[in-house]
Amino acid sequence: RIADLKAAGWYSGDVHVHANLFAQDLIKPADVLAVGRAEDLNVLNILPCNDPRTTLISDLQFFTGGPDPVSDENHIVYYNEEMRNDLYGHVGFLNLKTFVEPAYFGFPHSPHPYDAPGNFPQVEAAKRQGAFVSYVHPGLPSEFPIDIALGLADTIDVMSQVDERNSLPM
């Protein structure tokens, strides 16, 4: 390594991981930890979210409201949440104690087919429990300017793994 960032007080992490979204095999917390160790990541935030083709919320069975028991002194595996609406934007909730429901809305084939109530109530519910709120997937339509103005959004992604051309000009 060129530098020992941990010795300088820095920790590496990935705050937007989907372990089992579209996965063919079940990826368990120990598997996530193994990948994190291989990538030298100290913090792994897994974001359970809805599969847009079904009503399944991937990884919800691993949500505990705190670091997963596989975590150790150098690695934190934490199942949190990505709340999704394709009109208002996708939002990552980190440091959750309780999963925020509904976790998605505006998907016509689901129990939550309409674009209501908007992201604000879910974001507010996450903040009440001490969550860090991050708007993810730049380029999607989003209500993040409103939530930022109201003091509810902590950050927004500026780059996405799926749309680099539209992310970079932002």
Region spans (language model):
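Extended, charged catalytic domains and RNA/DNA-binding interfaces, predominantly
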Residues: 1-170
